[in-house]
Amino acid sequence: MSNISAKLVKELRERTGAGMMECKKALVEAAGDIEKAAEEMRISGQAKADKKASRIAAEGVIEVYAADGRAVLLEINSETDFVARDDTFKKFAQEAVKAAHAAKAETIEEVLAAKTSTGETVEEARKSLIAKIGENIQVRRVKTVAASTLGAYIHGGKIGVVAALEGGDEELAKDVAMHVAAVNPMVVSGDEVPADVVAKEKEIFTAQAKESGKPAEIIEKMIVGRIRKFLDEVALLGQDFVKDPSIKVEKLVKDKGAKVVSFIRLDVGEGIEKKEEDFAAEVMSQIKG
C-alpha cells in the first residue's frame, strides 16, 4: 500500500469522483495500474447502481434547455433533497438536458443513450454519479416542444415550465411560463377542458343550485354562470395574469400580437408518494413579494 503515491490517488479521485480511501483500495488491488483501477471502479459502480435501482427516488430537479425553436424538459430524481441540491447532481442534470436536446431525444431511452460533453452517455454518467454519491438516481420524465417562440421558467429546480407561442417574443413567453408555474392551469383555453370534467362540475353546481330553492330558469342561469367561471379558473387564457391581475392572460398575449399554442409543466416527484409541499404558492408569494 505504501507504493501507491498520493498523486496517483488524487488523479484517480478526480477521474472517478470516488472517495480517497476507495481510490487507494482500488489502486492497491490493481497493483498501481490506474486504468485497471478506474475500470474496476466503473464495474463496481455498475453493481452499486443496480442494487440501488429499487429504492424510491422522489426528490430531484427539473431542468430545461431551449434553443433553435425546440425545448426539452427533464425530471431527474434523487432519494433526498440534500443530494438534489448538490452541485455535482445539478451539473449532471444540466449535462443530461443539453445532451438530450442535441440528440433530439423524445424518450427516456433516447435521453440515456445521448452523449454528454465528456463523450460518455447520460446512462454512463448516471451510474457513475450513483457510485459517487450512494443514492438511486433516475431520469424519470422527458417532455419536448417546438415553436417559433419559446419561454422557459424554473422555480427552485422543483417546477419547470415551457410556454410555446406563435408570435410575441421570449420575454412574453417567459412571463406566460412563470404564470403557469404559479397558477398551474389545466389547459390553454376553456374549450380544451375534457367533457367529463365539465359534466362532473355541472352535476355538482346543479345540486348546489337546487338547494337555493330558486325557480328552474334562475337555477339554469346560475349553472351556466358557474360553469363559465370554472372554465376561466382552470384555463390559462381566462386567468388573471399573475404579475398584473387587472388583465387576463388572453389579453396580455393578444395585445402583443401573439397566441399561446401550448405549455408543458413538470413538478418534481409528481405521482410519487412523498411529502407534500405547495411550490405553486411559493412561486406566487415570491412574484408578489
Curated annotation (Swiss-Prot):
* Source organism, top-level taxon: Bacteria
Protein name as it appears in the record: Elongation factor Ts
Upper classification of the source organism reads:
Bacteria, Pseudomonadati, Pseudomonadota, Gammaproteobacteria, Thiotrichales
Q: Name one Pfam family in it.
A: EF_TS
Q: Where in the cell is it found?
A: Cytoplasm
What SUPFAM superfamilies does the entry give? Answer: Elongation factor Ts (EF-Ts), dimerisation domain, UBA-like
Q: What does this protein do?
A: Associates with the EF-Tu.GDP complex and induces the exchange of GDP to GTP. It remains bound to the aminoacyl-tRNA.EF-Tu.GTP complex up to the GTP hydrolysis stage on the ribosome.
Query: Which cysteines are disulphide-bonded?
Result: none
**Keywords on record:** Cytoplasm, Elongation factor, Protein biosynthesis
Residue ranges for the region (Involved in Mg(2+) ion dislocation from EF-Tu) are 80-83
Q: Where does this protein come from, organism-wise?
A: Francisella philomiragia subsp. philomiragia (strain ATCC 25017 / CCUG 19701 / FSC 153 / O#319-036)
A single cellular component GO annotation: cytoplasm
Q: Which CDD domains match?
A: UBA_EF-Ts
Keyword Secreted listed: no
InterPro entries on file: EF-Ts_dimer_sf, Transl_elong_EFTs/EF1B, Transl_elong_EFTs/EF1B_dimer, Transl_elong_Ts_CS, UBA-like_sf
Q: Name one GO molecular function term.
A: translation elongation factor activity
